[in-house]
């Protein structure tokens, strides 16, 4: 009504829209060292998988691959990841619900493909802070790009807000899951010591 106080505080957006737009690209996904990031949303409602590729030359690329309600289970994710173990360096998986089940499905000695030690990463708070810091640095330096047709990813990026974590900050807000998954994927690609694409390039 008339007497409702005016809210004057502004949301502390994590990624300025102009910074995000400056890194858009119409180029196809490059070839190179690949990693996946999986984020289960804070409210437990959805899960998002993103990919990151670091080519030998040129900027890295982040892309959203899929997002689905957690009510559909995690078998589709496990199948996707198990099929790509031989081409990806690692997968970084974070969230409250569904993580344990997914990790079991991809590392189980009978059904899982992810055998290499350290190829499945469950980030701590310090890792999350580092992943966000890395993505922000890469955006600022324009050393990472996103595919221009990925409007849902753009929406997540430019509406995410700063969420305090353990002395640093991560992405928060109602739609931060996609950009969180991208940050995890890029962090995995940058920090993993495993790179199956190197073997593929020999000869």
Task: Specify the residue positions occupied by each region the protein language model found.
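Phosphate/oxyanion-binding active-site loops and adjacent basic polyanion-contact surfaces
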Residues: 12, 45, 69-77, 95, ...
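Short, flexible loop/turn elements at secondary-structure junctions
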Residues: 2, 39-44, 53, 69, ...
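Charge-patterned, long linear interaction tracts outside catalytic cores
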Residues: 162-203
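Mg2+-dependent endonuclease catalytic cores in nucleic-acid-processing enzymes, primarily RNase H-like
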Residues: 56-167
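ATPase catalytic-site recognition across NTP-hydrolyzing enzymes
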Residues: 1-37
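Short, conserved catalytic/metal-binding motifs centered on acidic residues
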Residues: 39, 49, 91-94, 181
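Gly/Thr-rich phosphate-binding beta-strand-loop-beta motif of the actin/hexokinase/Hsp70
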Residues: 28-55
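Short, Φ-rich (hydrophobic/aromatic) sequence segments
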Residues: 42, 46-50, 128-139, 183-185
């Amino acid at each position: 009504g008339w007497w409702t106080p005016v809210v004057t505080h502004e949301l502390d957006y994590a990624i300025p829209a102009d910074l995000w737009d400056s890194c858009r690209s119409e180029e196809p996904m490059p070839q190179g060292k690949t990693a996946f990031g999986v984020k289960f949303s804070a409210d437990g409602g959805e899960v998002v998988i993103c990919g990151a590729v670091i080519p030998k030359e040129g900027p890295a690329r982040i892309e959203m691959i899929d997002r689905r309600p957690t009510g559909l289970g995690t078998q589709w994710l496990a199948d996707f990841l198990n099929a790509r173990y031989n081409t990806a360096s690692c997968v970084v998986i974070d969230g409250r619900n569904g993580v344990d089940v997914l990790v079991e499905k991809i590392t189980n000695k009978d059904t899982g493909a992810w055998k290499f030690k350290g190829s499945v990463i469950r980030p701590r708070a310090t890792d999350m802070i580092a992943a966000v810091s890395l993505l922000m640095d890469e955006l600022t330096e324009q050393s990472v790009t996103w595919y221009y047709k990925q409007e849902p990813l753009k929406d997540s990026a430019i509406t995410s807000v700063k969420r305090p974590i353990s002395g640093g900050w991560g992405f928060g807000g109602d739609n931060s899951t996609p950009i969180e998954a991208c940050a995890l994927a890029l962090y995995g690609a940058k920090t993993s010591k495993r790179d199956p694409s190197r073997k593929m390039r020999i000869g």
